[in-house]
Amino acid sequence: MDKEKSDPSCKSSDLKISNISIQVVSVPGKLPGRRPPRKPIGKPRPRKQPKKRAPFWNVQNKIILFTVFLFILAVTAWTLLWLYISKTESKDAFYFVGMFRITNIEFLPEYRQKESREFLSMAKTVQQVVNLVYTTSAFSKFYKQSVVADVSSNNKGGLLVHFWIVFVMPHAKGHIFCEECVAAILKDSIQTSIINRTSVGSLQGLAVDMDSVVLNAGLRSDYSSAVGSDNGCSRYLYADHLTLRYPLEISATSGQLMCHFKLVAIVGYLIRLSIESIQLEADNCITDSLTVYDSLLPIRSAILYRICEPTRTLMSFVSTNNLMLVILKSPYVRRLAGIRAYFEVIPEQKCESTILVKEINSFEGKISSPYYPSYYPPKCKCTWTFQTSLSTLGIALKFYNYSITKKSAKGCEHGWWEINEHMYCGSYMDHETIFRVPSPLVHIQLQCSSRLSDKPLLVEYGGYNISQPCPAGSFRCSSGLCVPQAQRCDGVNDCFDESDELFCVTVKPACNSSSFRQHGPLVCDGFRDCEDGQDEQNCTRSIPCTSRTFKCGNDICFRKQNAQCDGIVDCPDGSDEEGCGCSRSSSFLHRIVGGSDSQEGTWPWQVSLHFVGSAYCGASVISREWLLSAAHCFHGNRLSDPTPWTAHLGMYVQGNAKFISPVRRIVVHEYYNSQTFDYDIALLQLSIAWPETLKQLIQPICIPPAGQKVRSGEKCWVTGWGRRHEADSKGSPVLQQAEVELIDQTVCVSTYGIITSRMLCAGVMSGKSDACKGDSGGPLSCRRKSDGKWILTGIVSWGHGCGRPNFPGVYTRVSSFVPWIHKYVPSLL
């Protein structure tokens, strides 16, 4: 019992005799169903040990886990950085400035005080309305806020609300914010009545005049000035006396000058701003400017005028309402910046009258543009009716510095005229013209430009004999003027348009006549017209000064024409050769006719003008910091900005310039006409003057004397990187040159018809050589025989195609603009 208890492997239920069986076999026998075990042949196999499991945190796994961790960390950091950048740097604010008129609310004087309860309440109401308009629009997720800056009276009644709208959105989506789109949302929200046929509609309960809604893109700097707390140079000036002149003066000699003057007059009157002098840094309004607005906020479409350079000439501007904004900007005052001006309250004027004309072949009265002598405001309108006393008389209108021509499909830049149901365009010029209407009853309507204020117009009127416009013995010019018949074909441009010198029969001059020797236009002109050469003798002998003589610095005059900078000292004081360092030498050795490659260094005054990095126009060096080019290269808001322009000097192959300078300033002639290409000339001032060390590679070309005469058939050269053929898609990489000859002006006028005295033609009538697209603004260089210097005779302007037979190129005649050039570049005198 004890033994059983001591052995736990034994159990009492298993110990039964019946469960035991014994089988006895003999030794040599085999157990049934068993194979004898195999004896091992070799060494006994070692017993297999159980495999140990490797620990998880071994070196290899640690490296893998660490790599995965670093990858996750890098992805997370990059994602966070991307989110941060997208929230900070990639979002831009877009500012819009505008105004509209509320017709059903009367103006309160308290609205002038921005801290008053009345102003704050009205501003809150308008802001809530604007917020509702844009938060329910397609731009809702980008809309940030609206700010009412001013609430003013106006001459049409009600309130004029000036406001800002701000959007914030990713930079990549900024292109969807078109000015027209944002304005359309506001205008479309105004519900107008078709039945009442009125422009006044409901804008969330506000009665808004749809015609008054103006909305333009604005500048962040203007927004900050309008709504910011720092208004150190901002003034609100209210004028309520008709006889007073309110002074407007401010100046600074250093620091910055950023001033806003808000001018408001009593209801029913206008504001006239008169500027006596202004000091600015002339740079095309890039930094310094004085801008006059027909509003109380800087709304681009409400600009009346912009001044970009200093002036001491009295200028005055008139508003179209009882308010005006004047902004003076000069962020980096170097010497002096400021304005001296005054403003006054004036009544509105009606520009209409009926006039009875009595005189024949004389001018008996004057009409003028509105508010003369002020610049007349945009969108003004004048009507005049003229009636003559006789049916045989017509009406003659004499314009000063102005001309009207038939309206073309391009429209009119300076307003349009309707005269007896015929449409005309007006343009400014530097001489007078006469326009005749062959009718005893004349209805005239002037519709002013819708963009900016324009220069004042003064027009004389009178009657004339329809059957004989000019008196007997007179020649009728294309400009409408009448000149004595004796002045026809005398070599002098008496008509101002050269029409008296066209279609002249060339006759051999009467060299022996006293009148020819004393007053002949061919005398002392540098060309030998008489066989014995007497027309070119005694040309520097002192004579009394006239309009046809050359005047020295010591007031001595002589008959020699084109004496300035001709390489010969003619004046006793040497003043005729002062400042004549142009075209001192030339490496011109070989000429290739027909638009072939030039030689490097041949044309050291040639310039390539690049716009946004690409070659666009040509120009000529006339001094160390001034270039001369064509006005049409810079026509339009985008091209007139000097910022994207660079000048490449001393260049033979495109991309290999010896000197490159940004353009600081572009001066386009004030009379440039984009429809006719008249006055197609512009000056460019470099930001950096080219160094004297490059004078062997860069040289100025000589400016011709004022009124220089040229002879047809004279050989000259046109150069540039323009297209070699009209069908080419791009310009030449190598500077091209082509020999051309000056074409007779009569042939030029016969070919094109619209040639003015400020143009000349040059080319080869076969069409073999000509300028083409890309050459515009480049030089037409002619070599003077007397001293071998190169003269800038013309500037590539326009033409009919390129190299077409019988259609020569048209060039700006530089000699017609010498006084204008000297106005900006006096060092050339």
Swiss-Prot record:
Question: What is the membrane topology here?
Answer: Single-pass type II membrane protein
Name the Enzyme Commission number(s) assigned to this protein: 3.4.21.-
Report one GO cellular component: plasma membrane
Give me the stretches of Basic residues compositional bias: 32-52
Any idea which GO molecular function terms this record carries? serine-type endopeptidase activity; serine-type peptidase activity
Q: Which residues lie on this side of the membrane: Cytoplasmic?
A: 1-62
Q: Which keywords appear in this protein's UniProt record, sorted alphabetically?
A: Cell membrane, Disulfide bond, Glycoprotein, Hydrolase, Membrane, Protease, Repeat, Serine protease, Signal-anchor, Transmembrane, Transmembrane helix, Zymogen
Site entry: Cleavage: G255, Q256
Domain Peptidase S1, first and last residues per copy: 592-826
List the residue ranges of the region (Disordered). 26-52
Q: Which residues are glycosylated?
A: N401, N465
Which PANTHER family does the entry mention? Answer: ACROSIN-RELATED, TRANSMEMBRANE SERINE PROTEASE 7
Q: What does this protein do?
A: Serine protease which preferentially hydrolyzes peptides with Arg at the P1 position.
Protein name per Swiss-Prot or TrEMBL: Transmembrane protease serine 7
Organism listed in the record: Mus musculus
